[in-house]
Amino acid sequence: MRLEYFQMLDRIVDVDLDARRIRTVCTIPQANESPVFEGHFPGYPLMPGVLLIECMAQTAGWLASALVNFDIMPILAGVKEAKMRSAVLPGDTLEFEGHVIHEGSGFTVGEIKGRRDGKGVCDAQITYRMLPYPNPEFRKAIRDWAQRLQYPFAEPVK
């Protein structure tokens, strides 16, 4: 996880395109590894809920991208029913699981759950607007990022 760059996920664990499901994982940095924890909170560092939402949104975004072979890109359009169910601390490892519940009219909607040691810490419904990439270079940059996260591409990244 690279909080300051909003690269929230460490790895794409599994993508099942037929089932329209994804699993991702991330480890929250130690408190001394990120200035985020200097203010949230002094003496009791907690992962901000808004950054947990970003973890869920990135998980849903990778799935939305995968379902269209990275031919168009997801742009965050909405977050519904976001819930933070437990404090997340520096050093915690989280696994996110998501699945698509709707695709159509240029939108993809997914449900995402975050867990630590099998217990729920957060969940939300994430909506994406699916749009063309602004240029081929940006599409390649996103595919390269997916490859760094170990997305299981069937063909070489172009």
What are these regions (language model features)?
Residues 59-95, 123-131:
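Hydrophobic beta-strand-centered segment that forms part of the acyl-chain substrate-binding groove
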Residues 90, 100-158:
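HotDog/MaoC-like acyl-thioester-processing domains
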Residues 23-25, 97, 111-113:
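Beta-strand residues in well-ordered beta-sheet regions across diverse protein folds
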Residues 1-3, 69:
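Short aromatic-glycine motifs in intrinsically disordered, low-complexity regions
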